[in-house]
Amino acid sequence: RDLHTDNRRQRQMCIRDRSISLADYGMEKYAYDFNYAGAKIAKEVKDEFCNNTKKSEVFVAGSIGPTNRTASLSPDVNDPGYRAISFDDLVNCYSEQVLGLIDGGVDILFVETIFDTLNAKAALFAIDKIKSEKKLDIPVMVSGTITDASGRTLSGQTVEAFVISISHIPLLSIGFNCALGADQLLPYVKRLSNITNTYTSVHPNAGLPNAFGAYDQTATEMSELIENYLKENIINIVGGCCGTKPEHIRLIAEVARNYKPRKI
């Protein structure tokens, strides 16, 4: 609650509720409960702000991150054909999370940090199924992760291939987040902006991690790099990923207010 409140004070328009890899801690059976509770807290912060300010431009996005297993890659280098999880099992796992987020009151579903597009397709399939069952029309955002200088996701897709893979699904936005800082992500978001007619998003890390895994890029440095995206008019939605704090969000929001969003 304190984190959401701090970010809201820094003019964050979209509050993200998130959880990741519960199975690593033997807590996967609580997936629905964690996501329901997290979404409920974020919605309470949103409602409190909107009631106090009489404003309604704040949204809660339910963040659906990567699992600790991939459908396209083998965890065993000696058995490249092996898969640690099936598509159907992923759909079932994602369904629990999606149900928790929706029941908790999110306004948007945000499938993010996608390094394996087949996993993302399982998440999107689960979302579509639940939307049909509940007769809901909730917006869906998608955000991939370019893992290195090759310009590809971990499962080997380029920007263009990634977009084509999910272009059959009605989406609010397509973007990139995590792994890279704002300066490294810029060329890939440019390519994305040129080939999609949906809104685009970017949530970079605060630079690259240092030798201790911490992020040293200051809020001022990051906001200056984000301004390059705004000057080139290639994004509609902007935020931060690893290493970003409320101060980063505040300065990014201040810079973004001076520019119009990308036209589609």
Residue ranges and their predicted role:
Residues I85-G100, L154-S165, T218-Y229:
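Short, acidic/polar
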Residues L90, Y94, D107-D116, L172-L180, ...:
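Catalytic beta/alpha-barrel core
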Residues D17-Y25, T53-D89, L136-T153, T198-G213:
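N-terminal small/glycine-rich loop or linker at the start of catalytic domains
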Residues Y25-E44, F87-S95:
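Glycine-rich anion/phosphate-binding loops
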Residues T147-L154, I166-I237, R250-R262:
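Catalytic-face loop-and-helix region of soluble metabolic enzyme cores
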Residues F115-K135, G181-T196, K245-I252:
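Active-site-adjacent beta->alpha loops and helix N-cap segments on the catalytic face
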Residues R1-R11, I15:
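Single conserved hydrophobic/aromatic residue that forms the stacking wall/gate
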Residues A42, L101, L109, I174, ...:
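Conserved, mostly hydrophobic/aromatic
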